[in-house]
Amino acid sequence: MSRHATITQSYQERASLPKTSPVASYLLRLIAAKKTNLCVSADVSTTRELLQLAEEVGDSICMLKTHADIINDFGPRTIEGLKEIAAKKHFLVFEDRKFGDIGSTVQKQFTAGPLQIVRWANIINAHIFPGPAIITALSQARPRCRQLLILAEMSSAGNLMTGSYTEQCVVEARKNPEFVMGFIAQRTLNEQPGDNFITMTPGVQIGATGDGLGQQYNTPEKVIGEAGTDIIIVGRGVYGAQDKRAKAEEYRVRAWKAYEGNWRCYCNKR
């Protein structure tokens, strides 16, 4: 079976395709301008660590993934500091909240409480185990400039997000193109001619195969070059490094080369 058209197109070309949401279009243009398809997962526990990591890796990333609920001192200083650095370094913020409850509950989790996610996260994600109404509920609660990734697959061993669940994620995404910008998945899920979903892949680390807790690692070359995904998500491989700035740049270079190899290969066949 031939590979999907989005693998043969540049990020810049995809940004202008019909039905591409404003946030997705901005992200694709940002990726092309900065030459980075790297998202760093900031799995740290204090505001100081979060903001310091954002400063150190900001020039090498297109997106920073956060877990606000593990920040012990999360508050206004966290929010304003993160927004300031994101604007200065030109990256988007993705809160990995993994919403997965009934509609009225996820609306409150998104807009209220101490985290106030709607104020600062450009992108959020959700399971669709509760049913497609979760997409409607989050969409109704958001400003126009917020977008959703559906958690369609995971990188942990033995996870149940396979087969019919993943297929249904794609079905629901196609019904909501103005809000759903893509997926968290291990491979591109673009299959139909009009699909232009952005796929982000976690579990990327150089020189490791697992962590002993179920995580299974892949390389940038495998997920971008072979699986056709768009953005790699790297956590411990960067935030656990002594020189975080240099390590982020190493991942950026390898992921970008994998993308260029894919794109140039298909451009030469046109």
UniProtKB/Swiss-Prot annotation:
Taxonomic superkingdom: Eukaryota
Enzyme class at the top of the EC tree: lyase
Keywords assigned: Decarboxylase, Lyase, Pyrimidine biosynthesis
Binding-site residues for substrate, renumbered to this chain: 43, 65-67, 96-105, 217, 236
Listed Pfam families: OMPdecase
Active site: K98 (proton donor)
Pathway: Pyrimidine metabolism; UMP biosynthesis via de novo pathway; UMP from orotate: step 2/2
Similarity remark: Belongs to the OMP decarboxylase family.
GO molecular function, one term: orotate phosphoribosyltransferase activity
Organism placement in taxonomy: Eukaryota, Fungi, Dikarya, Ascomycota, Pezizomycotina
Catalytic activity: orotidine 5'-phosphate + H(+) = UMP + CO2
PANTHER family: OROTATE PHOSPHORIBOSYLTRANSFERASE, URIDINE 5'-MONOPHOSPHATE SYNTHASE
PROSITE patterns referenced in this protein's UniProt entry, alphabetically: OMPDECASE
Gene giving rise to this polypeptide: URA3
Protein name from the UniProt record: Orotidine 5'-phosphate decarboxylase
Any one GO biological process: 'de novo' pyrimidine nucleobase biosynthetic process
E.C. code: 4.1.1.23
